Amino acid sequence: MVIEIRPRETVMLAADFQALVTWYQDVLGFAVTDLFEDDYHYCCLETPSGIKIGIASAEEMEVEPADRSTNTVVLQIEVDDLAEFFAHLTEAGGTVTFGPSFEKTNEFWFGGFSDPEGNPVWVVDKNCP
């Protein structure tokens, strides 16, 4: 038996729900597609290219956020020009955690950054296989 699964958003639990939602909107260009604030705080966001994330209140989910730089699940995105993206990110107060570095075998640029709460995000350029 094969059970069909479908994509949904990757969810991040935020210590400061509104601040993290605003950062993903202002810095990375995500748009709010759904917002729930009555019984709990949860926001669905999506980029014009179709990347979906969800942000929820960690406190309401009874989760105490730890050192997020050690997360074993990492969001990865692609941009056309990594140097240009990192310049934008730095100007907007983002934190580049590594890179940009060039992968010689497959000839693409890669790096990483963290959002204001320390969630790691990996970035590759359009040449990444």
Where are these regions (language model features)?
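Vicinal oxygen chelate
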Residues: M1-E9, A31-I77, F86-S114, D125-P129
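Short, conserved charged micro-motifs
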Residues: A19, D81-F86
